Amino acid sequence: RWQRHGLNVQISETAWGQGAPLAAIEKALNADKAQQIKAVLATHNETATGVKSDIAGIRRALDAAGHPAMLFVDGVSSIASMPFDFAGWGVDIAVAGSQKGFMLPAGLAILGVSPKALAAMETARLPRTYFDFKDMLSAYARGGYPYTPAVGLIAGLAHSIDLLETEGLDNVYARHHRLAEGVRRAVFAWGMTPYAASADLYSDTVTAVKVPEGCDGTALVQLAASKYGMAFGVGLGEVA
């Protein structure tokens, strides 16, 4: 989708089941002598594979290369459920959604933005139509929105945040980890394995399961739903 905007996109590939390729990212940054790379984009927690990536490691790669590129992170399936240190990791834009850790229906995009990213916005030349921080900031200053807001979801978000703060984020993270670890132990007991290549990559919000050769994953999902009333998602992309 970035290429649809006419942007020059350099993709650092990694095998499915692995996290963001830190060495490849640092190599690309070091090779950019003219410092033309504007931003590094990464997904913190990949839903299709159940893999979390080392965002702090990407920040270290940027710092080691002395590169001024910004760091944009998709945190849709991790923020409010797993530790996410926006300031400590030097993230410039983080994107979350109402439908994951904030426990609401889909419909809200929740963004965090750094002063550096806001400053870059002032000189950005790419046309924006659907979303523009300038529109948002101008409307917020007047106590409103540049569109008709989803009032019900916004009210629900306020309640969700109250719940998260009442429980305490450390307790929220511990709860998700405990439940995820229980799921992973069950997966191993069934003779299957998580799709993530190693334990340090395990997500605490989604576990993608690798079924044995000859096992029909879709049939397994259907059996769990019909016999046990349990809902599992089918694979996405290359793990479908």
What are the roles of these predicted feature ranges?
Residues 99-185, 189:
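Active-site C-terminal subdomain of aminotransferase-like
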Residues 87-99:
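Conserved active-site segment immediately N-terminal to the catalytic lysine
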Residues 1-30:
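PLP-dependent aspartate aminotransferase-fold enzymes
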Residues 188, 192-240:
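Conserved C-terminal alpha-helix-loop-beta "cap" of PLP-dependent enzymes
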Residues 11-12, 41-42, 71-75, 94-97, ...:
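General beta-strand structural signal in soluble alpha/beta enzymes
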Residues 20-78:
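Active-site phosphate-binding strand-loop segment of PLP-dependent enzymes
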Residues 16-19, 46-50, 79, 102, ...:
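Short, small-residue-enriched loops and turns at beta-alpha junctions
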